[in-house]
Amino acid sequence: DAYALMKVLFFNHGIKDFLLLSNMVRDESQGRKVYENLSRVVAKFMRGVCIDYAGCIPWDGLLQKGVSRREPVICCYPESPSSRSFRALASFLIKRNGEQKPTDGNIKFFLKRLMDVAKDESRAQ
């Protein structure tokens, strides 16, 4: 759970800046509500922590089909709601972080690949 992980990272490692990506939400409104609720709790119990909203990934049936096929949803169903959200996330991260290249860790590697796909697609349009 995001709150538990944030507590560990803040209290044990001094990390104060976080991005929240709401996953498996009904829509953007629900994603923002998750962010607002978490922000209120964090502001109350973890002073000095900053959470930015990175967006949301909505639940859609095509996402599950991609998982079943063992293919990234963005490849097999590029126009699905979740694929559009992944592209929006990649654009957000590119704008936020410029052209920094992740150098370590599996999550950084995944995000780098996701951002590269988004760059290639935006150039093709």
Enumerate the predicted regions with their spans.
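Conserved C-terminal guanine-recognition region of P-loop GTPase G domains, centered on the G4
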Residues: D1-F18
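C-terminal lobe/tail of nucleotide-utilizing enzymes
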Residues: K16-Q125
